[in-house]
């Protein structure tokens, strides 16, 4: 549902939608993602705050024929991606956390995607609610892609809009996502 509402906002033919079996670790590592300016991952995040190299994203664990496959994209693999994305959105639980290393800062998924080439990453600070996250992301992309707001302003506008709705008024539903990196420039999807 989240992916469908976002892809509907992009220009026809401007995106790659990989869901279910097609959302694979192999696709993420294939280099194909380097063609796109915005990457949105709506999946499960794995956080290992003691051994951050074991953190990652979970893609399909079975292929179209029902055979098991490695669906775990680990942090060291993320560091080695070569991305041209203006923005990476990690729409999963605790994707903005990591391990604090003295003299280095926070080691986690955000740093991995920035090291891979993304100047800005939207990530979560806690275990987020699925329905609220889908609504927040829909509003975020509407503000960014339709209204032309920079990513930081679009996220703020989406969060303010949700905070004004009775159902989503609690900050638990909308405040968990933050933008890391360069916040002022607009993002152009491909």
Question: Which residues make up each language-model segment?
Answer:
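Catalytic cores of enzymes
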Residues: 1-190
């Amino acid at each position: 549902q989240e992916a469908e509402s976002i892809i509907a906002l992009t220009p026809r033919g401007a995106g790659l939608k990989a869901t279910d079996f097609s959302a694979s670790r192999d696709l993420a590592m294939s280099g194909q993602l380097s063609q796109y300016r915005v990457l949105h991952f709506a999946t499960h995040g794995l956080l290992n705050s003691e051994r951050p190299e074991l953190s990652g994203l979970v893609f399909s664990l079975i292929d179209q024929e029902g055979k098991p496959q490695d669906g775990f994209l680990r942090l060291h693999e993320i560091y080695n991606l070569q991305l041209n994305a203006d923005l990476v959105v990690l729409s999963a639980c605790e994707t903005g956390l990591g391990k604090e290393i003295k003299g280095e800062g926070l080691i986690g998924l955000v740093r991995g995607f920035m090291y891979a080439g993304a100047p800005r990453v939207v990530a979560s600070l806690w275990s987020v609610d699925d329905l609220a996250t889908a609504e927040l992301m829909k509003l975020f992309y509407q503000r960014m892609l339709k209204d032309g707001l920079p990513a930081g302003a679009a996220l703020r506008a989406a969060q303010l809009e949700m905070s004004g709705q009775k159902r989503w008024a609690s900050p638990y539903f909308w405040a968990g996502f933050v933008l890391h990196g360069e916040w002022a420039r607009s993002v152009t999807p491909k």
